Every structure is written in C-alpha cells, then in structure tokens.
Amino acid sequence: MMKVLVVVALLVTLISYSSGEGIDDLEADELLSLMANEQTRKECIPKHHECTSNKHGCCRGNFFKYKCQCTTVVTQDGEQTERCFCGTPPHHKAAELVVGFGKKIFG
C-alpha cells in the first residue's frame, strides 16, 4: 500500500510540475533519470546483503525492518574499513522468538 501511495504522489507531483512553466526546461533524458532514481530508491536490500552505501535501505523481515549492522574490518595491510550488512538486531530476534513461541502454544 505504501508503494502505491509513493507512486501516486510521484505522478501527482509530475503532473502538477508539467502544468507549470518548468516542464519546458526538463528534457526527456532528465525525466527518465528522475524516474530511474525513484525506482532504485524503492528497491530494498535483503537480509545478509551489504548495506555500507545505503544504511537505511534494508528490507522488512517477518515482524520488523532489518537494521544495517556495521563492523570494522582490518585488512592484511592494516587498513581499517567499515563493512555493513542488513540483519535482525538481538532484541528483534528475541521478540520474534517470543511471538513464535506464543503462536505454537496458543495456535
């Protein structure tokens, strides 16, 4: 439902912008690149995939949105870099465990 609202908002914005005076300044290539940027923003990063460059783009899990968890990695050269992945934080894992256990007991 949220995706539909975002697409509708984008279309309303484009239509209102086209009725204004600024549409003549926009070329077709610029409009296509704007729509491509919107599409890539909607795509989310699955669990256990790298999110170093997009720390707020993780997908939703069963109950919660995955969080971007980062660690510092030291290479053989001694250089430190930050690597991040989408995962479930420990407190979310505990909540999912309790809910799963409750479903087994109460059906």
UniProtKB/Swiss-Prot annotation:
Top-level taxon of origin: Eukaryota
Q: What's one GO MF term for it?
A: toxin activity
Answer whether the UniProt record assigns the keyword Zinc to this protein: no
Recite the UniProt keywords alphabetically. Answer: Disulfide bond, Knottin, Secreted, Signal, Toxin
Which InterPro entries does this chain map to?
A: Spider_toxin_CSTX_knottin (IPR019553), Spider_toxin_CSTX_Knottin_CS (IPR011142)
Signal sequence range: 1-20
- Compartments, record wording: Secreted
The organs and tissues expressing this protein are described as:
Expressed by the venom gland.
GO CC aspect terms: extracellular region
What are the cysteine partners in each disulfide bond? C44-C59, C51-C68, C58-C86, C70-C84
Query: Any chance you could tell me the propeptide residue ranges?
Result: 21-41
Q: How does the record comment on the protein's domains?
A: The presence of a 'disulfide through disulfide knot' structurally defines this protein as a knottin.
Which family is annotated?
Belongs to the neurotoxin 19 (CSTX) family. 04 (U1-Lctx) subfamily.
Name used for this protein in its record: U1-lycotoxin-Ls1b
